Amino acid sequence: MPLNREDKQAVVAEVSAQVAKAQTVVLAEYRGIAVGDLTKLRAKAREQQVYLRVLKNTLARRAVEGTPFAPLAEQMTGPLIYGISEDAIAAAKVVNDFSKSNEKLVIKAGSFDGKVMDKAGVQALASIPSREELLSKLLFVMQSPVSGFARALAALAEKKQAEAA
């Protein structure tokens, strides 16, 4: 069922609001994907707080007008699914991970930090660890010397107790 003008304006407003908050937008062709697989992709996107939507390209072009993602408009051809996220890596990671298991989802382009990326750029962005992963690695590295020192002190205390007994 075609959308009337008010519905189209509502869709553009909704997507524009998401794009205004976004750091990353990823475009992927979804030609031939089964509905069940697309539902799994949407569920994974929701888990990662990625706004995932199939849009008419003309509506998507209007939504990105006047934003840092405007250069993506020339890539918006064919049946596309749009991944939009506030996290710099989440959209790229969700779409890239799904495209590895389903060859019918083809990454077309993306934009991060005002720069348009091709498929290789999106894949490179997806390979970067998330902020949480980096923080946990940093915490581990910082805790390692402290825990080693604590173990050395405990061993020294046990040795002193053994000598005293």
Swiss-Prot record:
Annotated keywords: Ribonucleoprotein, Ribosomal protein, RNA-binding, rRNA-binding
UniProt keyword Ribonucleoprotein present: yes
GO BP annotation list: translation
Highest taxon listed in the record's lineage: Bacteria
GO molecular function term, any single one: large ribosomal subunit rRNA binding
An annotated GO cellular component: ribonucleoprotein complex
Pfam name, any one: Ribosomal_L10
Classification via InterPro entries: Ribosomal_uL10, Ribosomal_uL10-like_sf, Ribosomal_uL10_bac, Ribosomal_uL10_bac_type
PANTHER family assigned: 39S RIBOSOMAL PROTEIN L10, MITOCHONDRIAL
Protein family per UniProt: Belongs to the universal ribosomal protein uL10 family.
Function: Forms part of the ribosomal stalk, playing a central role in the interaction of the ribosome with GTP-bound translation factors.
Complexes and interactors: Part of the ribosomal stalk of the 50S ribosomal subunit. The N-terminus interacts with L11 and the large rRNA to form the base of the stalk. The C-terminus forms an elongated spine to which L12 dimers bind in a sequential fashion forming a multimeric L10(L12)X complex.
Name listed for the protein in its UniProt record: Large ribosomal subunit protein uL10
Source organism of this protein record: Burkholderia cenocepacia (strain HI2424)
